[in-house]
C-alpha cells in the first residue's frame, strides 16, 4: 500500500511556507492554535454571509496570520477581493470588529489586510468551492470536473488532479472518482504543488473533494 502524505507538509521549507507565523511557550501553544482557528472561521463565515456569487465561490485562497506581543496581523489572499471591498467601504472595519469580538483581545491590536491573487482558479481552495457549488446544484460530477480543468488551463498550470469521494450522483454505494490532466509529480519535493481537501454537503450526503495542482518545478 502506498503511504499518502500531505503534499503541503511534505514540502514545508522548500516550496511551501507556513500560514501561521508566531512563537509560543509549549504551555500556551494550544491556545495560539485555537485562536488561529477562531480567526479563520470568523473570516470565512463573514465572507460567506456577505458575498453572493452565482458560482457559490467565496474566493479565499488562504489566510496568513502573523503575531507579535502587541499586534495580530491577518492577511487574506483573495481571488475576488472586489466582493468584499467595493460593495461596502465599511465591510473591512466590520470584519475587523467581528474578529476582535470573537477573540476578546483587549491588549493586542488587530490588523486585517486583503491581497489579491492573480489567476484565482489556479488555486485549489477556490477551485474546490467552484466544484462544490456545481455539485450542490446537481450538475453531473464529470461535467463539474471537466469545467474545473478548463478553468485551471486558463490559469497557466502544468497539471491537475481532482478526486471526488462519497455517494456520487446519489448512488447507494459510495465510491471514488478521479481525473488527471498534465503532470502531477507528488514524489518530487522540488515540485511546487498546491493541495486542498474540501467537504461539501449535498442532498445525498457529504462528498469529499481533493485537488492537487502542479504549478512549477524548482
UniProtKB/Swiss-Prot annotation:
GO molecular function, one term: rRNA binding
GO cellular component entries: chloroplast; cytosolic small ribosomal subunit
Subunit structure: Part of the 30S ribosomal subunit.
Name of the protein in its database record: Small ribosomal subunit protein uS3c
Residue intervals passing through the bilayer: none
Keywords: Chloroplast, Plastid, Ribonucleoprotein, Ribosomal protein, RNA-binding, rRNA-binding
Subcellular location: Plastid, Chloroplast
Top-level division of the source organism's lineage: Eukaryota
BP GO annotations: translation
InterPro entries assigned: KH_dom-like_a/b, KH_dom_type_2, KH_sf_prok-type, Ribosomal_S3_C_sf, Ribosomal_uS3_bac-typ, Ribosomal_uS3_C, Ribosomal_uS3_CS
Underlying gene: rps3
Keyword Ribonucleoprotein: yes
Family statement drawn from the similarity comment of this UniProt entry: Belongs to the universal ribosomal protein uS3 family.
Organism, as annotated: Gossypium hirsutum
KH type-2 domain sequence ranges: 43-118
Amino acid at each position: 500500500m502506498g503511504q499518502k502524505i500531505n503534499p503541503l507538509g511534505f514540502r514545508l521549507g522548500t516550496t511551501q511556507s507556513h500560514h501561521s507565523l508566531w512563537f509560543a511557550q509549549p504551555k500556551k501553544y494550544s491556545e495560539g492554535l485555537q485562536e488561529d482557528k477562531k480567526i479563520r472561521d470568523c473570516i470565512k463565515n463573514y465572507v460567506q454571509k456577505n458575498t453572493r456569487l452565482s458560482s457559490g465561490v467565496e474566493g479565499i485562497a488562504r489566510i496568513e496570520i502573523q503575531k507579535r506581543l502587541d499586534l495580530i496581523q491577518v492577511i487574506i489572499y483573495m481571488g475576488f477581493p472586489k466582493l468584499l471591498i467595493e460593495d461596502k467601504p465599511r465591510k473591512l472595519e466590520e470584519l475587523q470588529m467581528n474578529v476582535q469580538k470573537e477573540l476578546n483581545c483587549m491588549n493586542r491590536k488587530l490588523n486585517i489586510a486583503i491581497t489579491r491573487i492573480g489567476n484565482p482558479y489556479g488555486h485549489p481552495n477556490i477551485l474546490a468551492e467552484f466544484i462544490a457549488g456545481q455539485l450542490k446544484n446537481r450538475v453531473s460530477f464529470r461535467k463539474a470536473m471537466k469545467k474545473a480543468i478548463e478553468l485551471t488551463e486558463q490559469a497557466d498550470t502544468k497539471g491537475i488532479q481532482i478526486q471526488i469521494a462519497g455517494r456520487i450522483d446519489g448512488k447507494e454505494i459510495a465510491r471514488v472518482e478521479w481525473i488527471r490532466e498534465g503532470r502531477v509529480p507528488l514524489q518530487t519535493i522540488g515540485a511546487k504543488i498546491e493541495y486542498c481537501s474540501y467537504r461539501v454537503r449535498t442532498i445525498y450526503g457529504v462528498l469529499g473533494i481533493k485537488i492537487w495542482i502542479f504549478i512549477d518545478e524548482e
